[in-house]
Amino acid sequence: MRIFNTLTRKKEEFIPITPGEVKMYVCGPTVYNFFHIGNGRTFIVFDTIRRYLEYRGYEVKFVQNFTDIDDKMIKKANEEGTTVKEIGDKYIKEYYEDADKLQIERATVNPRATEYIEDIIDFVAQLIEKGYAYEVEGDVYFNTKKFNDYGKLSGQSIEDLQMGASNRTSSIADERKNDPMDFAIWKAQKPGEPAWKCPWGMGRPGWHIECSCMAKKILGDTIDIHAGGMDLTFPHHENEVAQSEALTGMRFANYWMHSAYVNINNQKMSKSLNNFFTARDILKEYDSDVVRFFMMSAHYRLQINFSKDLLDSAKASVERLYNAIGNLENLIDEVSRENISEEEVNYLNSLKKYREKYIEKMDDDFNTADALTVLFELTKDTNTNINVNSSKELVNKALNLIRELGAPLGLLQKITKGSLEDEIESLIQQRQDARKNKDFALSDKIRDDLKDRGIVLEDTPQGVRWKKIN
């Protein structure tokens, strides 16, 4: 398996620190609003990579944080007349709701920055003690000149970084720095802001130090993969490298991965430009398979343009794949022969080439676009060569292979009519029992869970009916 490493700017063989295990940290959302589909691409991309690593047999410890204290959250809390904690609680809940609908698997750990304040204070204190940070009137800055490798992740020269930092220097706070490139790792309290007691007075952590601290605390001094959106490469990830490696003297992450932007009219989708669609808005019109297919249709390091036309095209493609699955499921009920023939064994062995080709594509820096092509080749083959004269065993094995290759992409796992009917009927009965017992929370949960899997329930005078939705 080869991964493009932002740090070295080339594809490298993936060799985990511990054989068979992967320690992976992905920068998660700042929880002050619903996440937009550009953020969603990052979450879907690294969910897919995590799924594929598990498919290949790795045990993945997947950490994705919540930034629940920063300037945007303070501003939001002030606007809504509430607390930063309440804003965080609200939008973490909303994140899970949308992420679950996008079939994004829950992280092994979802740390909140505010849960690690004591660890962050200790991290900052050690950097000061080592001479990598200094305090000015309650603010603490990282001394970038002290860290000789500053700029190595983003590939920028010190001269370019200094020029850019000088151009940005305009405030009194900047003038107090030893160097324009220095960045805040602890911020003194301002009126009306939440703060914690520390050796430098009341204050709160800087954004960059939060991820460094949580990654170290949960995964250790050196991790296998650190990932996030391309826009985080500099300054966020660059600063993470500096402060983490300054503290430990060890390499922070062996592989750095970054997903490209989602664009609208050739501009990056962002809240600041007000040119975004929330994932929640999109999910009102398209289901998770369609959104994920759209994201997977381009390599994760290539920018992708967002449009309803492209989503409609993705929807048509997903329907083709589900039609192939539906054809096989219908055949299971139609074929009369149970056991596979010798000729069918040879054909089934020929289908294995699709698994091998799929793995070859995904092992090459997670090339999901080519992996989707393999899926279409497989379904075209089964549509052509499997029919009512085939054995039930062959039909089942072909069906399982399609679903197997869809799973790492988070695709093709929804129920289709004609399969798993017993499970649906059982859930409908559980829902009816819950309603009789006035357990409406359970009743609603069963209904919503089925809807997320592509099944809609209809309460009629004749009883409950169900149907598949696109």
Swiss-Prot record:
Main localisation: cytoplasm
Reactions catalysed according to its record: tRNA(Cys) + L-cysteine + ATP = L-cysteinyl-tRNA(Cys) + AMP + diphosphate
Cellular localization per UniProt: Cytoplasm
A single Gene Ontology CC term: cytosol
Top-level taxon: Bacteria
Motif ('HIGH' region): 29-39
EC class (word): ligase
Pfam families: CysS_C (PF23493), DALR_2 (PF09190), tRNA-synt_1e (PF01406)
Single GO BP term: cysteinyl-tRNA aminoacylation
Annotated positions binding Zn(2+): 27, 211, 236, 240
Cofactors required: Zn(2+)
Cofactor binding note: Binds 1 zinc ion per subunit.
Presence of the UniProt keyword Acetylation in the record: no
Keyword Cytoplasm: yes
Motif residue range(s): 'KMSKS' region: 268-272
InterPro entries associated with the record: Cys-tRNA-ligase (IPR015803), Cys-tRNA-synt_Ia_DALR (IPR015273), Cys-tRNA/MSH_ligase (IPR024909), CysS_C (IPR056411), Rossmann-like_a/b/a_fold (IPR014729), tRNA-synt_1_cat_dom (IPR032678), tRNAsynth_Ia_anticodon-bd (IPR009080)
SMART domains: DALR_2 (SM00840)
Binding site for ATP: 271
Keywords: Aminoacyl-tRNA synthetase, ATP-binding, Cytoplasm, Ligase, Metal-binding, Nucleotide-binding, Protein biosynthesis, Zinc
GO molecular function: ATP binding; cysteine-tRNA ligase activity; zinc ion binding
Entry's EC annotation: 6.1.1.16
Family: Belongs to the class-I aminoacyl-tRNA synthetase family.
Subunit record text: Monomer.
This protein's name: Cysteine--tRNA ligase
Organism: Clostridium botulinum (strain Eklund 17B / Type B)
Encoding gene, per UniProt annotation: cysS
